[in-house]
């Protein structure tokens, strides 16, 4: 009989018998300041609106007895004196296989008109740091389905790779190719701070219905509040970790880490943190490695391979965010505007890009092929101006002549249509034939 009542007793114990209520004192910039309620940083609160509804906000900090809150969905209808209710817990999201094939927002709510989740496996958005000793070394290659990556810039399972470029050079399209063609068990795709119209385009034209069934999309568009964009990044990462715990190889496709950094900047500046590098406060550069370190191995057989797009402002690859991210990642894919303008897609600059896993996942023979291809591209680049202007005379240098003869074939190898596929088993032989 005692066992019969245990479940009910637990439910009674979980009931909050005390309600913590505060009052809105002022709205300053992006923040709501309230006197009370009793709460902790990261807790969710509900704020009364004039129309009788409530808006969800998160506790970001304290100023004496005042609580600094940022709303997820704007401040419309909030007045001084409105009640603020603490939920005494942080954001919780549904973690179950029901997520596959779904599109959710930064609060974990479905937005794809396919109904609510039936499973109630909700978990608070709290991360446990992975012991570095438990992280496996790179051993196996993940196939991206992008010929230039699989052939010249291989990516290992558990690796974290940045896709760097200025605006309009094809970062999102490259992510779409990887999402559609990779051999990952699950895709977790994060659209953070991007244009809303891109979502349906991505699903219909780049991902496809079949691949959507193996994917989870987390969306927080550019018109949403900074806290929404910020949390969306962690929601996507936590979902990737959930599938990794099941032993699956997960591709985390994140567009873009720059928008995440901008959201964190807006939040930090609102709290009064001083800017130190091109308008970015110190906490932005603390937050980036915290997020990126979530990818990789967990020691239980699963992996999260991270592909993070980085929008380089003004094509300046030394700007603070891009430079900081480079130091954390295990590889850099550089998209070249000059290649893009010449109609070479994907416009990946092989010479400027690097993968730090090549020596662990590729045989010595394959490494030699890659180095030979890079050497030919380097020679051609050194003499490119002389070749284009007709100053270089054929026969002046055997190495240059050989590079000139192979350059069109290498460029043809690099070029790949959005819906074009290839046989990975024949890739090495194809490279050998090009370079012979």
Swiss-Prot record:
The broad enzyme category this protein falls into is translocase
EC number(s) stated in the UniProt entry for this protein: 7.1.2.2
Q: Name one GO molecular function term.
A: ATP hydrolysis activity
Task: Specify whether Transmembrane helix is a keyword of the entry.
Answer: no
Annotated catalysed reactions: ATP + H2O + 4 H(+)(in) = ADP + phosphate + 5 H(+)(out)
Alphabetic keyword roster: ATP synthesis, ATP-binding, Bacterial flagellum biogenesis, Bacterial flagellum protein export, Cytoplasm, Hydrogen ion transport, Ion transport, Nucleotide-binding, Protein transport, Translocase, Transport
Protein localization: Cytoplasm
The cross-references to Pfam families, in alphabetical order and at most eight, read: ATP-synt_ab, ATP-synt_ab_N, T3SS_ATPase_C
Q: What is its main location?
A: cytoplasm
Q: Does the keyword Lyase apply?
A: no
Q: Which InterPro entries match?
A: AAA+_ATPase, ATPase_alpha/beta_chains, ATPase_F1/V1/A1_a/bsu_N, ATPase_F1/V1/A1_a/bsu_nucl-bd, ATPase_T3SS_FliI/YscN, FliI_clade3, P-loop_NTPase, T3SS_ATPase_C
The family note in this entry says: Belongs to the ATPase alpha/beta chains family.
| NCBIfam families to which the protein is assigned, alphabetical | FliI_clade3, fliI_yscN
In its UniProt entry, what is this protein called? Answer: Flagellum-specific ATP synthase
């Amino acid at each position: 009989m005692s066992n019969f009542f245990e479940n009910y007793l637990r439910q009674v114990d979980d009931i909050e018998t005390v309600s913590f209520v505060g009052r809105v004192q002022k709205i300053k910039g992006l923040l709501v300041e309230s006197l009370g309620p009793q709460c902790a940083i990261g807790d969710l609160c509900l704020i009364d609106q004039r129309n009788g509804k409530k808006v969800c906000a998160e506790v970001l900090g304290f100023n004496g007895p005042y609580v600094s809150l940022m709303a997820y969905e704007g401040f419309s209808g909030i007045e001084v004196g409105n009640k603020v209710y603490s939920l005494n817990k942080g954001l919780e999201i549904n973690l179950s296989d029901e997520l596959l094939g779904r599109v959710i927002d930064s609060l974990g709510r479905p937005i794809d008109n396919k109904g609510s989740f039936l499973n109630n496996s909700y978990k608070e958005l709290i991360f446990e740091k992975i012991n570095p000793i438990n992280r496996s070394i790179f051993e196996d290659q993940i196939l991206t389905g992008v010929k230039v990556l699989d052939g010249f810039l291989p990516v290992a399972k558990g690796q974290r790779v940045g896709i760097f470029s200025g605006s309009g050079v094809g970062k999102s399209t490259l992510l779409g190719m990887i999402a559609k063609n990779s051999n990952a068990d699950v895709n977790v795709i994060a659209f953070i701070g991007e244009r809303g119209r891109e979502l349906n385009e991505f699903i219909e034209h780049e991902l496809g219905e079949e691949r959507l069934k193996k994917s989870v999309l987390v969306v927080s568009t550019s018109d949403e509040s900074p806290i929404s964009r910020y949390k969306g990044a962690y929601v996507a990462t936590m979902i990737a970790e959930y599938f990794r715990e099941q032993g699956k190889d997960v591709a985390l496709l994140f567009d873009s880490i720059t928008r995440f950094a901008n959201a964190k900047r807006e939040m930090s500046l609102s709290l009064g943190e001083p800017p130190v590098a091109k308008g970015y406060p110190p906490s932005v550069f603390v937050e980036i490695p915290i997020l990126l370190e979530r990818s990789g191995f967990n020691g239980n057989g699963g992996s999260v391979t991270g592909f993070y797009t980085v929008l380089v402002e003004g094509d300046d690859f030394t700007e603070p965010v891009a430079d900081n991210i480079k130091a954390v990642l295990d590889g850099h894919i550089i998209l070249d505007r000059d290649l893009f303008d010449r109609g070479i897609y994907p416009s990946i600059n092989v010479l400027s890009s690097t993968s730090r896993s090549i020596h662990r996942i590729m045989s010595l023979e394959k490494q030699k092929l890659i180095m030979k291809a890079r050497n030919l591209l380097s020679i051609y680049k050194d003499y490119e101006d002389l070749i284009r202007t007709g100053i270089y005379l054929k026969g002046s240098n055997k190495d240059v002549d050989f590079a000139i003869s192979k350059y069109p074939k290498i460029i043809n190898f690099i070029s790949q249509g959005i819906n074009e596929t290839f046989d990975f088993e024949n890739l090495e032989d194809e490279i050998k034939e090009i370079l012979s």
